A protein has these predicted regions:
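Alpha-helix boundary/N-cap detector
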Residues: 2-5, 9, 113, 137
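Active-site scaffold of zinc-dependent metalloenzymes
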Residues: 4-7, 12-61, 69-76, 82
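Post-HEXXH active-site segment of zinc metalloproteases
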Residues: 75-115, 139
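Pan-zinc metallopeptidase signature
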Residues: 88-96, 101-102, 125-199
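An active-site-proximal "capping" alpha-helix that borders the catalytic cofactor pocket
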Residues: 111-128
Length: 199
């Protein structure tokens, strides 16, 4: 995939920031990357290793890189929602693996709010670096991803890679192009779309 000058500058910036904070930067030429538990995804940031990983053989790779770099900034800045999520994310993954968890609604809410904060950061990053991304569409996809956390509370499962919330056209089209939605709880209208689309 040919990269633009601005994309190359952004990649270098992310690599430099990763080096500065002793984070391994792994940009992999694949469509998906595999997380613990054999979960396919497009990327992640893990503060424990620490490592930033992005699958780059996909059309939305630059958006994913902006998103994962946004998580790195949350960690570096130690924003309050990041600190809360240090406990909650582990609880959410344990719950998805079948373990009972008290207060799962609270923990999923923290994970959702972490992603909402991060999606807003990603939009600022995309604008700052002048990356070629349709921001209205990106925000719709971001809203679908954030709302997915509410749906996950109902289904107790992660989405399938081929039918993820940000890839499902009907779900994305139902989202706002601004970060102005009701994020808690899932509205009946959106719940019906998630159910109909089998996400």
């Amino acid at each position: 995939m040919i990269k633009t000058k601005k994309e190359l500058q952004f990649i270098q910036f992310v690599k430099d920031e990763c080096k500065k904070h002793n984070v391994k930067c792994s940009l992999r030429p694949s469509k998906y990357v595999i997380m613990d538990g054999n979960v396919k995804c497009s990327g992640w940031f893990d503060e424990e290793v620490p490592e930033l990983v992005v699958a780059t053989n996909r059309p939305d790779w630059i958006e994913i890189l902006a998103h994962e770099y946004g998580h790195l900034t949350q960690w570096v800045e130690q924003v309050p929602i990041w600190k809360k999520a240090e406990v909650s994310l582990g609880k959410v993954w344990e719950w998805l693996d079948g373990k009972n968890c008290r207060s799962i609604q609270k923990h999923i809410g923290v994970a959702r709010d972490l992603e909402l904060d991060n999606e807003k950061r990603a939009v600022k990053i995309i604008k700052k670096f002048g990356l070629k991304v349709d921001l209205e569409h990106y925000v719709k996809k971001a809203n679908a991803y954030v709302q997915f956390y509410n749906w996950m509370l109902i289904t107790r499962r992660w989405s399938k890679p081929k039918n993820s919330p940000y890839k499902n056209k009907n779900l994305v089209n139902a989202m706002s192009s601004k970060f102005n939605m009701k994020y808690d709880p899932l509205t009946p209208k959106l719940e019906k779309i998630f159910q109909t689309e089998n996400i």
